[in-house]
């Protein structure tokens, strides 16, 4: 059994949960690589990544390269003398980095590969109405999320679950799967499976303003899945127009109501405590939303200070 000397690479909160589990299982993490500090928010203050915050709090050796091919970074990386690297929600690695340790570099990806390769697997699984998803560990190669698979674990997606809730459950599942992967590697019992490509593979495209916008002519399930799949971040959005005022709103939570009606898709109907949007097979009842420059609020709270006319619509 070879004693593992691990370098961990990751940036967001999802990666922190995995790193914490590795540390708590008494593995030797000789270095942590995370994104360089960036200014964020209105004040453009320097913001540390979640992984950096964790590494500093736990006195772990930390490197923050801007260029992964930089000679000085590569020298520092080599000097850590790791025999295994683990990547969780980081960035694409050059070959000179991923082939450095003799036991290889493996990645934890939040989908059942080969489906949902790419930047936003948790979101797209919900957006596309999947009923199950999971996590996969695989050895990195020179493409994105295509390497030989080591282990995977599957869970059901709950009918009303949003991306944030699924994120947390997959982080827990991923932690267990990474530890199981470490055990087979250190015992020399790794059996990998090649990913098979076919035309039915679904992709986890990068999220942008365009693919986060609600199309109110789609079915109720499609709209509701988009809202769930983008909540709480970055959030599904649309335009709201009432008389001469137009603004963009973010919708965090909604409910599908299958009721017959004769309204045009996008018509907004509001009562004293509820807002419903007409769609082709019923209504989408809005539960939680955000107006520009305001905080997120429940619909009942919004209706305490605002009323809508009969002309109100979304698009």
From Swiss-Prot:
Q: Where does (6S)-5,6,7,8-tetrahydrofolate bind?
A: 111-114
* InterPro entries, per the entry: Fmt, Formyl_trans_C, Formyl_transf_N, Formyl_transf_N_sf, Formyl_transferase-like_C_sf, Met-tRNA-FMT_C, Met-tRNA-FMT_N
Catalyzed reactions: L-methionyl-tRNA(fMet) + (6R)-10-formyltetrahydrofolate = N-formyl-L-methionyl-tRNA(fMet) + (6S)-5,6,7,8-tetrahydrofolate + H(+)
This entry's Gene Ontology molecular function terms read:
methionyl-tRNA formyltransferase activity
EC code(s) of this entry = 2.1.2.9
The alphabetical list of record keywords is: Protein biosynthesis, Transferase
Q: Looking at its record, which EC class is this enzyme? A: transferase
List the record's Gene Ontology CC terms alphabetically: cytosol
Similarity-based family: Belongs to the Fmt family.
Q: Which HAMAP family match?
A: Formyl_trans (MF_00182)
Relate the protein's function as given in its record. Answer: Attaches a formyl group to the free amino group of methionyl-tRNA(fMet). The formyl group appears to play a dual role in the initiator identity of N-formylmethionyl-tRNA by promoting its recognition by IF2 and preventing the misappropriation of this tRNA by the elongation apparatus.
Q: What is this protein called?
A: Methionyl-tRNA formyltransferase
* Origin species: Flavobacterium johnsoniae (strain ATCC 17061 / DSM 2064 / JCM 8514 / BCRC 14874 / CCUG 350202 / NBRC 14942 / NCIMB 11054 / UW101)
């Amino acid at each position: 059994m070879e004693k593992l000397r691990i370098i961990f690479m990751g940036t967001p909160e999802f990666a922190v949960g995995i790193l914490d589990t590795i540390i708590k299982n008494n593995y030797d993490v000789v270095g942590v690589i995370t994104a360089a500090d960036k200014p964020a928010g209105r004040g453009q203050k320097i913001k540390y990544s979640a992984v950096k915050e964790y590494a500093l709090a736990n006195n772990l050796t930390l490197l923050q390269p801007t260029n992964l091919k930089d000679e000085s970074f590569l020298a520092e990386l080599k000097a850590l003398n790791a025999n295994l690297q683990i990547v969780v929600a980081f960035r694409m690695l050059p070959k000179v980095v991923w082939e450095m340790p003799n036991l290889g570099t493996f990645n934890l990806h939040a989908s059942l590969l080969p489906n949902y390769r790419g930047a936003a697997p948790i979101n797209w699984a919900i957006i596309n109405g999947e009923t199950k998803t999971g996590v996969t560990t695989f050895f990195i190669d020179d493409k994105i999320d295509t390497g030989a698979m080591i282990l995977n674990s599957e869970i059901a997606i709950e009918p009303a679950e949003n991306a944030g809730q699924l994120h947390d459950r997959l982080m827990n599942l991923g932690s267990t799967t990474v530890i199981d992967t470490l055990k087979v590697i250190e015992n020399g019992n790794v059996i990998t499976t090649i990913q098979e490509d076919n035309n039915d593979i679904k992709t986890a495209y990068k999220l942008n303003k365009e693919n986060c916008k609600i199309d109110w002519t789609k079915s109720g399930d499609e709209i509701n899945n988009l809202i769930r799949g983008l909540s709480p971040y970055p959030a599904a959005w649309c335009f709201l127009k009432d008389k001469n005022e137009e603004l963009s709103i973010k919708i965090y939570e909604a409910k599908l109501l299958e009721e017959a009606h004769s309204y045009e898709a996008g018509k907004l109907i509001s009562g004293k405590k509820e807002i419903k949007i007409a769609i082709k097979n019923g209504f989408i009842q809005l539960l939680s939303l955000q107006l520009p420059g305001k905080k997120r609020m429940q619909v009942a709270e919004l209706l305490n200070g605002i009323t809508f006319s009969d002309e109100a619509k979304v698009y």
